[in-house]
Amino acid sequence: MKNNINLQDVFLNQVRKENIQITIYLVNGFQLKGFVKGFDNYTIVLDSDGKQQLIYKHAISTILPITPINFMQSSKKQGE
């Protein structure tokens, strides 16, 4: 059976686990900076300056991490 990797979940889980700061660009151009505290299929919880924000994924255009994410390392851990 082939393992399907959900790239979105791998990315969000790694920035959450490693406490990597991200910048989220919304479709309206607004920027949010902070740390991912949790996520599900529809939302991301972002901690920004000690305040939590619930962001709907359909409103997100782009997510930029402050450091590069190694997808190969993350996908191996999930496959184990």
Swiss-Prot record:
InterPro entries: Hfq, LSM_dom_sf, Sm
Pfam families assigned: Hfq
Gene Ontology CC entries for this record: cytosol
Annotated ranges, domain Sm: 9-69
Highest rank taxon of the organism: Bacteria
GO BP of this protein: regulation of DNA-templated transcription; regulation of RNA stability; regulation of translation, ncRNA-mediated
Purpose of the protein: RNA chaperone that binds small regulatory RNA (sRNAs) and mRNAs to facilitate mRNA translational regulation in response to envelope stress, environmental stress and changes in metabolite concentrations. Also binds with high specificity to tRNAs.
Subunit structure: Homohexamer.
Protein name per UniProt: RNA-binding protein Hfq
Organism: Alkaliphilus metalliredigens (strain QYMF)
